[in-house]
Amino acid sequence: MGDEEVQALVVDNGSGMCKAGFAGDDAPRAVFPSIVGRPRHQGVMVGMGQKDSYVGDEAQSKRGILTLKYPIEHGIVTNWDDMEKIWHHTFYNELRVAPEEHPVLLTEAPLNPKANREKMTRIMFETFNTPAMYVGIQAVLSLYASGRTTGIVLDSGDGVTHSVPIYEGYALPHAILRLDLAGRDLTDYLMKILTERGYSFTTTAEREIVRDIKEKLCYVALDFEQEMATAASSSSLEKSYELPDGQVITIGNERFRCPESLFQPSFLGMESAGIHESTFNAIMKCDVDIRKDLYANTVLSGGTTMYPGIADRMQKEITSLAPSTMKIKIVAPPERKYSVWIGGSILASLSTFQQMWISKQEYDESGPGIVHRKCF
């Protein structure tokens, strides 16, 4: 890496959205849905220069004639051909760069299978010919973005939620807990409870409307039972939302019933611990000497932690689970939707990080297994 002027690229591939941009920037340049769409019928759009696949926003806007697929499920890449299309789109259409001219920092889910990191490494060097690359664990990058190296990160996105204890920059794999309950499930649940109110949302297009309602109007109640009582006795919590066709719908207790599932997964018919318990359980799996540092540095990250009221509720729930004298601090940075990306941007622009990159030469000498030695 002789030439220091070459900007590294940072790509955070989430289950729902892909965030991409340049190291040193304070926000990603490109944020688009992690979807690949293929035409349902051959030759519907003859003469329109029909492509065999569409990625991101273009796939979203043409979804009526396409079959949409998410190549990342629960944070983990399951379809590599489509993943390659997303990366190609990221470099050439969104960032408009030549990947062979820039080091690339990618992110991965905690507990990502070893074969997956090797596959990512191989694709970067062999398909995109990058000069250097690195794979960072998402939760660790979020922690860096908050200015810490020790803490526990509750990272909740569209496809998966993880509680990840981190000590001096290293994720502690034995204590990481995964919860397959995230934004997509909350959108589905909101669709279901709005149906009970007499509104029907079923298609994928309507699902996007519900996701928008969720993002604009939902919040987490500090005391769920009390909030339910308030909602029943007055209309003070009701809000209206205008649908694209001009119809106006009113939503009341659905506003907080939907995200309550994060704390009570039984609402979704799931028998798992809520986000507060899984964070507590992850702390309890750590050495007793570092727990104090984890309680005092509990960092929220990802789009599904963006609900108003979530930090106060976490504080209340963890306080009731933890020893009574313990100091508990929930950190909820306003930019937490992008904190994984921001952490990657910070890391890739540090002068001390420059020797951490896996170079093309090292890859050629050692093969994809080098990723386990250099990225941990």
Swiss-Prot record:
Molecular function terms, GO-annotated: ATP binding; hydrolase activity
Q: Keyword Metal-binding, does the record have it?
A: no
Q: List the disulfide bonds.
A: none
List residues traversing the bilayer: none
- Classify the source by domain of life: Eukaryota
Give the enzyme class: hydrolase
Q: Which family does it belong to?
A: Belongs to the actin family.
Task: Give the matching PANTHER family.
Answer: ACTIN
Q: What is the role of the protein in this entry?
A: Actins are highly conserved proteins that are involved in various types of cell motility and are ubiquitously expressed in all eukaryotic cells.
Name of the protein described by the UniProt record: Actin-2
